[in-house]
Amino acid sequence: MRFAYSWLMDHLDTEWSASAVADELSRLGIEAELLHEGQDPAPFVVARVGAVKPHPSADKLKVCEVFDGADHMQVVCGASNVREGMLSVLARCGAVMPNGGPTIVEAVLRGVKSHGMLCSADELGVQGWRAQDSGILDLPSSDYEVGDSFFLSGAVIEVGVTPNRGDCLGLRGIARELVAAGVGALRPLPVADLEVFGRSPIEAEMRSAGVLMGRYIKSIKNTGDSPRWIKDRLISAGVKTISCVVDIVNYVMLVLNRPMHVYDADKIQGGKLVVGASSNTDFHALDGKKYTLSKDNLVVTDGAGVVHCIAGVIGSALSGCTLDSENIFLESAWYDPVDIAMSARKLKLSTDSSCRFERFTDPGCVKLGLDFASHMIVKYCGGVASDVVACGETPFSEGRVISFNPDSVGVIGSVEIEREEILRILTALGFDVNADKDRQWEVSVPSWRLADVRSSFDVVEEVLRMHGYDKVQEQPVVPCIAGPNGCNYDEKLSLIMLSAGLTEVVTWSFMSGAVAEKLGYSIEDLCVENPVSNKFDVMRPSLLPNLLQTAASNQACGCESVAIFELGEVYRFLDESERSICGVRSGDNVPRNPHGATRKFDFFDAKCDVLQVLTQLGIDGRLVEFRSCDRSYMHPARSADVYFRDILCGYVGELHPDLIGFFEMRSAAACFEIFLSRIPNVDDNPTGDEFLVHKYQPVKRDFAFVLDQGVQSQALVDVVGCIPGVAEVSVFDFYCGDNIPEGKVSIAVAVVMISKVGTMTESEIKDVSERIIALVAQKLGGELRAD
């Protein structure tokens, strides 16, 4: 919405400049931009046409002498209605025509110089001048003087109003905000008492949620031009002028954020207007288009059932107010925002009226808007008004009272504000405050703020907003996991993952409930009350689903190999979360090259990532157990739960093959997730083996053991690794087949032996080897493979 600064001054008594007012609005949370400060001299001025002569080289052109109040100049004009003595609008050289038009320059037209251009209504982007559908504007001398700026002079401010602040879609609301911030005082609204003739011949009935008030005004004259000051203000707001009555209604809408509709009363049958649900019928609207209505549309019908208006959206061409209308019915209403939003979206139609009703209009302003508009119509169009017709009620008839503790401002906002200042701010914003009790105030919400002020938290927000968000101290959004010396593990874990070739991503804290259920999660306690869409209707119970979708999206864009991770919160309930780190690898681990074959990411890549994470957290990898898991979304034979000290800390493995297609991934995915909040205190555990340079030569030996298939390779590594003299143990082969009994498996390990006192002798090597074989037999029931 945009408006002239001088128009705002009709409602705000202040000495602040336009630039300062725009800056203050932005500080208050209403985005404001100063479009321009006004130009001097004005680019579009009222000018008088002097002598008019035929063009020497063109029959349809005329050479005019024009006076703009300062200079006489020659202008070539092709309008058929140009004549000596008329007042019109001159676009001076340098003027930029509205709506993206050209810049006016000095030109030579068929051999004759032209210093500017005389303008038509269409060229200026305005309407409402009678009998001027073609030709240049013929301005009435009673309203305009030569040399005046045609458009309202001075600065123009444009504001971007958020959906929750519909009250600021009117200049009165903007002025009210500025007054609360200490920018001047609010001027009174000029509404005088009306002389009425009695009861309206048209009654009203409300069959839906809402309130309708109206007045019958008879014997008006709508054939004259609107007063210039109304036209100027509408033009500054980008609203085209139509007729005096319609201009007044639009003017009141922009001042009070009170959309209204005017009916030609002579077209209403049965002496009655009824607001209710529509039936399936065609509707010819004021915009010249035909719409098919349904039960989702709220409409206004007459006593004969004829639809005269889509309530809160647009009127009918059948009963719209025209220049010939003599008797009108003026409607001012409050409709449920949900009803209007549903109706407008069903028709794929958005109007100034529907945008305002959707964002909530002030239910306490229905009669004020009706009185204001009625007063102006009678003043400028004549006629006599009836008594007010009223029906229906709003859900806010009892108002809203909020229990508010003023101490909560300091607790929530981390800023100290005196109680007297809190009381001043709330009172200035229109809240009625009962501060008799020391700790709990009773705060009555003004009618224009009923849409967005619903709880004590909203009251705190209002206080902080007016006090200044720049005075609120910064607080950490998410607490970081800190080590024993205060080190930031989040940062360290990110660096470890980055060094392992994974890229960090950030996904939504929401996800699709259907996807969560597909992975076997219960979403009953995770549903969002008012989701953005059905793709984000639950809080995420795991980081994995969103990462899989991210990986699939990257593969769909041509990135065949993906390795990503995320650190974030996962939820067990809406108010209970825990910290987690999750990673996904999919595609080729080794890209195509001339030196060897490629390899896909698998279980062991993800397992390596898990061990790196746990090692960074101070956990000895030898104390980590990988136990079989039965997670429905993981591969049944290539996945494991991760345990430390018998505490389930996460899981690792390959994604179930059925889900590869579900997520539309192009290859198998290896993934892991570690729940960091479950990791116990690990201060007493080593963060890794100390790196030593050995003086003596190591000895390498390979051992192949036949073990039960249920024995994990890690168990074999742990048993062999605990023997003195053994420095390193690694698995290099698995085998099931010929010469291996049924139910058995051959696991081969490479063992590095080192002595700290000297080079190992054959007898020492033999002694360590025999101890390895004996301990494996004792602990695991394994036998050294013979062949």
UniProtKB/Swiss-Prot annotation:
B5 domain boundaries: 397-474
Origin species: Anaplasma marginale (strain St. Maries)
GO molecular function: ATP binding; magnesium ion binding; phenylalanine-tRNA ligase activity; tRNA binding
Alphabetically ordered keywords of this record: Aminoacyl-tRNA synthetase, ATP-binding, Cytoplasm, Ligase, Magnesium, Metal-binding, Nucleotide-binding, Protein biosynthesis, RNA-binding, tRNA-binding
UniProt record similarity statement: Belongs to the phenylalanyl-tRNA synthetase beta subunit family. Type 1 subfamily.
Catalytic EC class: ligase
Bound cofactor: record note: Binds 2 magnesium ions per tetramer.
Protein name, per record: Phenylalanine--tRNA ligase beta subunit
Domain FDX-ACB: residue ranges: 694-785
Catalytic activity: tRNA(Phe) + L-phenylalanine + ATP = L-phenylalanyl-tRNA(Phe) + AMP + diphosphate + H(+)
Principal location: cytoplasm
Residues covered by the tRNA-binding domain: 38-151
Gene3D superfamilies (alphabetical): 3.30.56.10, Bira Bifunctional Protein, Domain 2, Ferrodoxin-fold anticodon-binding domain, Nucleic acid-binding proteins, Phenylalanyl-trna Synthetase, Chain B, domain 3
Enzyme Commission code: 6.1.1.20
Lineage of producing organism: Bacteria, Pseudomonadati, Pseudomonadota, Alphaproteobacteria, Rickettsiales
Organism domain of life: Bacteria
UniProt: Mg(2+) binding residues: 452, 458, 461-462
Membrane-traversing stretches: none
